[in-house]
Amino acid sequence: MSTVGGIEQLIPDSVSTSFIETVNGSHQFTIQGYSLAKGMSPGKFIQSDIFSVGGYDWAIYFYPDGKNPEDQSSYISLFIALASDSNDIRALFELTLMDQSGKGKHKVHSHFDRALEGGPYTLKYKGSMWGYKRFFKRSALETSDYLKDDCLVINCTVGVVRARLEGPKQYGIVLPLSNMGQGLKDLLDSEVGCDIAFQVGDETYKAHKLILAARSPVFRAQFFGPIGNNNVDRIVIDDIEPSIFKAMLSFIYTDVLPNVHEITGSTSASSFTNMIQHLLAAADLYDLARLKILCEVLLCEKLDVDNVATTLALAEQHQFLQLKAFCLEFVASPANLGAVMKSEGFKHLKQSCPTLLSELLNTVAAADKSSTSGQSNKKRSASSVLGCDTTNVRQLRRRTRKEVRAVS
């Protein structure tokens, strides 16, 4: 999914487009000696030569005495007929009796400008026609500018409807995948053009201020902000481990999480989780939004009874609300609660984040409410599993509310 103007839009795996259009062509039919054609009787016609449009043959039929005997030769009739052995041909038509005075006041009957009313006309078989039995009153024709020197000029336009399907375009040249991230990583590794050095423990990492500023609002303010120092060329980092800072730099340049096992030199799950926890804290420190989300997702995926307490403490410290809610739900599960309380991380949690016990109690109580009956049993269950009596719980809640008011 992508977001445009706040609206999520689907990004499909493949696309195709159907183009419904007309293939147009025209034919001009001239009738010399109109007066000699009169008296042929109704239903008799003069046919144009056959012409082709859109891969089909067509012909113009002119009826000097009209097509219907009921009209008693009061009207001329004009039609366009399908001359091909084809079925169900859909088309638009236009028949025009040309003004020969030069004024341009032609007599036009067009289907093109009425296509939306009922769609194209369908000719079912060879000989099917479209046109008008009462195209023009004959007495008016014979005194008009459409007839000149005993000559009529008829123009016919046909638009055959075609559907054309287009899929992804195939090119002979293969478009390579973007290697921008790798190019920037090579720039970082080679130290070409670096203008800032970070002293992290016993390690020194060089980088480029512009790239750091483009990726991190914190670095941007530090180097180019109103109170920043663009002339600084060395910064000492005291609160991040070297391996964590190196991993963070790699992400800044590549937008890809580095191989954690290679950085830690261990394949154990605990080393992985510990690394991601520290990387999440670093991402929060430098406001790397995408890295924060990636780390939160990984911690949720790797959550277990041994690491949930330390992850919950981290989420509380940095106010990662979604991660915190996920951890609370995990701990409150009857299948996990007992084992979590026996972990070393839980002991640390009670000491470092005592206010979390109140929230955890509420979460356990809510989970307990859905699985047990009897309000008193639920209260005893929720408080006892956390090793608290109800007096301590009330005191903890009051203390929590005071701390919240003090902060706000």
From Swiss-Prot:
InterPro entries assigned to the protein according to its UniProt record, in alphabetical order: BACK_BPM_SPOP, BPM1-6, BPM_C, BTB/POZ_dom, MATH/TRAF_dom, SKP1/BTB/POZ_sf, TRAF-like
Function: May act as a substrate-specific adapter of an E3 ubiquitin-protein ligase complex (CUL3-RBX1-BTB) which mediates the ubiquitination and subsequent proteasomal degradation of target proteins.
Domain BTB: 194-261
Keyword Cell membrane on entry: no
Keywords for the protein's UniProt record, in alphabetical order: Cytoplasm, Nucleus
Tissue expression as described in the entry: Ubiquitous.
UniProt source species: Arabidopsis thaliana (Mouse-ear cress)
Assembly and oligomerization: Homodimer or heterodimer with BPM3 and BPM5. Interacts with CUL3A and CUL3B. Interacts with RAP2-4 and RAP2-13. Binds to MYB56 at the promoter of FLOWERING LOCUS T (FT).
This protein's name: BTB/POZ and MATH domain-containing protein 3
UniProt xrefs under PANTHER family: BTB/POZ AND MATH DOMAIN-CONTAINING PROTEIN 1, BTB_POZ AND MATH DOMAIN-CONTAINING PROTEIN 3
UniProt-listed GO biological process terms: cellular response to salt stress; protein ubiquitination; regulation of protein ubiquitination; response to osmotic stress
Subcellular localization: Nucleus; Cytoplasm
Listed SMART domains: BTB, MATH
Sequence similarity: Belongs to the Tdpoz family.
Recorded metabolic or biological pathway in which this protein acts: Protein modification; protein ubiquitination
Single GO molecular function: identical protein binding
Domain MATH stretches: 24-158
One GO cellular component term noted in the UniProt record for this chain: cytosol
Keyword Nucleus: yes
Record text about domains: The BTB/POZ domain mediates the interaction with some component of ubiquitin ligase complexes.
Record Pfam families: BACK_BPM_SPOP (PF24570), BTB (PF00651), MATH_2 (PF22486)
